[in-house]
Curated annotation (Swiss-Prot):
Tree of life domain: Bacteria
HAMAP family attached to this UniProt entry: PRAI (MF_00135)
Phylogenetic lineage: Bacteria, Pseudomonadati, Pseudomonadota, Alphaproteobacteria, Hyphomicrobiales
Organism: Nitrobacter winogradskyi (strain ATCC 25391 / DSM 10237 / CIP 104748 / NCIMB 11846 / Nb-255)
Coiled-coil segments on the chain, per record: none
CDD domains, per database record: PRAI (cd00405)
GO biological process: L-tryptophan biosynthetic process
Enzyme class: isomerase
Signal sequence range: none
Gene: trpF
Pathway where it operates: Amino-acid biosynthesis; L-tryptophan biosynthesis; L-tryptophan from chorismate: step 3/5
Keywords: Amino-acid biosynthesis, Aromatic amino acid biosynthesis, Isomerase, Tryptophan biosynthesis
Protein name as annotated: N-(5'-phosphoribosyl)anthranilate isomerase
């Protein structure tokens, strides 16, 4: 299976076009006001129309209520909802029932105990995203540019696909993929020149590095007896 590359926190037509032309599989749009990447619905509608089926559209939310989710879905028409807050298993189940969209649940990781509830989340989500657990007093649940110990995911066994996030950049994505064997990588701050400001060259470099990491891993595993 091919490695999924997601560029998250896109907010301008030009950087979205760069991500699409460089071959991103998923493009993420943030709907969380404390984030410098937050989008108003009118802008989200414009950017969503620009995608035109060239990549999967992902709406990132955190503990959003039904009214908020309804507005986001109407504006963006996402292919996937990324739940990046403290959504419970019953809440995830309710969101899927009400809106009929697949869900990717973000799991904050710092220590092995943070993975204890994986079976419960895997039973209701369609995909998992492992991100660094934010510091105690952080105002945002992600996009902080901080990695976690990827070795915690070594030999991970879950029944649904998972992606990796948290502190990824062109310079470390090869190690990240090799250690975790993640099915996808998700980057935001690692392709920015300033918080919320995507850098076209960094976006291209990351996607290129992720594809190279995918090739290296495939070649390495093909030689395992």
């Amino acid at each position: 299976m091919s490695l999924i590359v997601k560029i998250c926190g896109l907010s301008t037509p030009s950087t979205l076009d760069v991500a699409l032309q460089a071959g991103a599989d998923m493009v993420g749009f943030v709907f969380f006001p404390p984030s410098p990447r937050h989008l108003e619905l009118a802008r989200a509608q414009e950017l969503g129309a620009q995608v035109r089926g060239r990549a999967a559209k992902v709406a990132l939310t955190a503990d959003a209520d039904d009214e908020t989710l309804c507005g986001i879905i109407e504006a963006l028409r996402p292919d996937l909802l990324q739940l990046h807050g403290k959504e419970t298993v019953p809440r995830i189940r309710e969101i899927k029932r009400r809106f009929g969209l697949p869900v990717m649940k973000a799991i904050g990781v710092e220590i092995a105990a943070d993975l204890a509830d994986l079976p419960r989340y895997a039973a209701v989500a369609d995909r998992l995203l492992f991100d660094a657990r934010p510091p105690k007093h952080a105002t945002r649940p992600g996009g902080l540019g901080v990695p976690f110990d990827w070795r915690l995911l070594t030999n991970l066994s879950v029944d649904i696909p998972f992606m990796l996030s948290g502190g990824l950049a062109a310079g470390n994505v090869d190690d990240a993929v090799r250690i975790t064997r993640a099915g996808g990588v998700d980057v935001s701050s690692g392709v920015e020149s300033a918080p919320g400001v995507k850098d076209a060259g960094m976006v291209r470099d990351f996607i290129r590095a992720a594809r190279a990491a995918e090739t290296s891993l495939r070649e390495a595993t093909s030689h395992v007896p």
